[in-house]
Amino acid sequence: MWKNFKLNKFLLFIPLTSLMFCFNSPKNDDEKMQTIMVSVKNTLSYLHYSPKPINDAYSKDVYKHYFEMIDPGKRYFLQSDMNEFAKHETKLDDYINQGDLQFYKLTIDRLYQRVDEIDKITQEIFSKPINLEEDETLTLESKLKKVPADQKEQYNEWKKFIKYNILQEIESMNSKEEAQKEKKDSVQKFKLKDTIKLEILSPQQKLTKATDEVKDLVKETFTRFKKRKKMDWFSVYMNAYTEVFDPHTNYYSPKDKEDFDTQFKGKVIGIGAIIQEKKGNLYLGALTIGAPAWKSKKLSEGDKILKVKSKPKEDHVNVVGMLSDEAVRLIRGEKGTPVTLTVQKKDKTIVEVTMIREEVAIEDTFAKSIIVNSPNGKKYGFINLPSFNADFEDEKGRNASDDIKNEIIKLKAQNIEGIVLDLRNNGGGSLTEVGDIMGLFMNAGPYVQVKDGNGKIQTLKNKQETPIWTGPLVIMQNEISASASEILAGVMQDYGRAIIVGSPQSYGKGTVQTFVDLNRFLNSEDDFGSLKLTIQKFYRITGESNQRKGIVSDIQMKDFFTYAEIGERYDDFALAWDKIPSATFQKLSYFDVKALEKASNDRMAKNANYQLLLESAQWREQLDKEETITLNINKFNDLMKHRKSQIEKFKKLTKFDNGLKFEMYPAEIEREKKDEVFKKKSEMWIKNLRKDSYLQEAMNIVADMKAKV
C-alpha cells in the first residue's frame, strides 16, 4: 500500500501546551518506552480528530495490524508462537493504558530467536544441492499464506522462497544473454566496428552463480537484521497503535523525525555525499557538485569508509559493519563544524579528509521547469513540482511557492503561451504553500475549508491580489498525487481556473496533520520522539471532502497506477468521506471543459502508444493477481517465454518519442558546460520527458485552451 505522509504546518498554534503528562525521568530504555506508550495514548485520546475508544475491539485491530507489519510474508513466526501471542489479542488496550511492555518484548524477543533459527535453516539449505526439477509451487499472495505449523514446514517454505529467488536470478542471466546476442547480431548485420564479447554460461554454471548470489543476499539480509537494535522495533509497535486511528497518524522516533524534516525542508547539513551499504561495508556514492566532499578533491564515488570523527574532541569511530543510517548521523551535524572521514581508495591507499559541514540542497525536492517547443510552432512551459516543501525554521529557506513563482517568471521571459503544472507523484506537504501557489494563477479568494474534531469550520483564503500567470493552465495528476496536491488541483478545478488531466482520481487524502513533540508534555530532558497526529479534515470550497474519493480529473487518462490498489479508499483505517456547506466563491469562465475533453478523447482514441500503454497496464494487473508460481525450472522457463512473448509487443513503448522539443534556459546551458553531473541529470530528465505520452497530450490540451476549443 502506498502511503504519503507529509507535514502540514497549518494550525500548529493549537493550544497543546495545556496538555501535560507528569512522569519521572526514565532511568533506562524500558522506562523510556513505557513513558512513550502512555504519552502516545493520552495524546491520541485528547487531540486526535476522531479519537477511538481504547477497548478490546481496538486491541484486536492493533494486534492484527502489528503482525501485518512485522511478519507480512508469514516467514518468521510459527503457529505455536501465534497461539501463544493470541492470549494477548484483547489486552493491548490495557498495555498501552498502563505502559506495559510484556507483549512487545515477547514478540520482538521471539522474532530475534526465530531469525537466528532461520539463519541456520538457510545455511543448511544452501549447504545441499538445489533441485529445481521438483514440481513445487510458491504462494505469492500473503493473505493466502498460512503461518508455518512447525520448523519442518518453515524449512520447506524458506527452501521454496530461496528457489524462487534463484529462478529469478537465472532468468535475469538469460535476459542479459539474449540482449547480448541481439546486440552482437546487430553489430554483425550492420558491420559496425564495436566488439561484443558474448558470455554464455551452461545451465549448471547459471545455477551455481545464481545460488551464490541469493546466498549472499540472504546472508546480508540476516546480518543487517541482527545489527538492528531491538528498541528500533518499538516505533513499529507504536505505529500499530497509532495507525488504527488513521493511516496518517504515526509515531516518529527522534532519528525518524530528523529524516522527515530533512526531506521536507529539502536540505541537509553535511558533506553532500550519498552513503551506500554493500555486503557489510559503507561506500561513498554520488558526490553533490559544490558540496564539501566534492570540494575536498580527495574523495570519490566508490571510496570505502573506514572511520568517522564527528567532533574535534571525540575519537574516530570505526564504521566498518555499521548500518548506513547510523554512519549518516555521525557525518551530519551542525553547520560550520568539522567532520573527518578516513577512507580506503580503490588502489587500497588510506586517506583522511577533514571537511566543514555545509547546508546541502536536495535538488530533487524542488520545482523545476523547461521550455517546450510544440510541433505547432508555439512555446509552452512545463513545471514539475515534486512536493509542497517549506522550511518553517528558516524564513530565508526555500519553499514551493517561491520556487514556482521563479519558474513562471523564467518561462514568461521566453514568451510561452501556456503552462502545464505536473503534480504527478507529489504526495503533498505544506498547506499554506497551496494558497500561495494558487495566488500565482488567480486573484484572492478561499482555497480550502478545514474542520476540527469539535466541528468548527474555518475557511482559508489566498490573499494575493495580483496573479503573475493568467493564461492557459493544465494540472497533471495521478493516483499518487495526494494531500496538498489534491487541495491545489481541487480548488483550481472548482474555480474553473485550470483543466485537471490524468488518472481517473487522485489518492484521496483529505486530512490535516501536525507534529506533536512528546518532550513538551514530559518533565524530562530525554528525547521521546514525536507523534504526527491527524487534527483536522479539509474540504474543497464546494464543501466536498477529498477523503477517499480524491480529485476526479476533467480529462481522464489511465496509467499503470489506475489498475493497482493505490489510494486512501483501500486502507482499512482511513477516515470516512463527508460533506460540509460550500464556501462563498465565484466560479470563473475560462474554458469549455466539455469541448476540451472531446478533442482530447478523440486524439487519445487514435494514439497507438497510449492504447498500448493501457494494454500493458492491464496485463501487469493480471500478473499482480497471480496467487502462486511454479518452482520447476522447465515450467518456470516456459512461463517466462510466454511472458516475454507478451512483453515483445510492449517494446514499442521504450522507443516512443512524443515529438516535443525541450529547450533549457540560457543560464542552464552555461552551467552544463561547467557541471557534468548537472548536464547528465538534465539529459536524463529530457530523455524521460520525450517518452511521456501523457505530457504529449497535456501539451495538446493547453494548446487547445489557447486556441479556445
Predicted regions located by residue number:
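Cleft-lining beta-strand/loop regions that shape enzyme active-site pockets
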Residues: 23-28, 45-55, 223-230, 246-270, ...
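Bacterial Sec-dependent signal peptides at the C-terminal "C-region" and cleavage site
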Residues: 8, 18-31
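Extended, domain-scale alpha-helical bundle/helix-rich regions
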Residues: 121-270, 274-279, 676
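Conserved functional hotspot residues or short segments at active or partner-binding sites
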Residues: 125, 141-143, 156, 160, ...
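Charged, amphipathic alpha-helical regulatory modules used
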Residues: 25-133
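Polar, glycine-rich mid-to-C-terminal structural blocks
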Residues: 484, 496, 501-566
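Acidic/histidine-rich, surface-exposed loop or edge segments in extracytoplasmic proteins
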Residues: 37-49, 87-91, 216-220, 386-389, ...
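PDZ/PDZ-like domain segments forming the peptide/carboxylate-binding groove
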Residues: 52, 68-69, 90, 104, ...
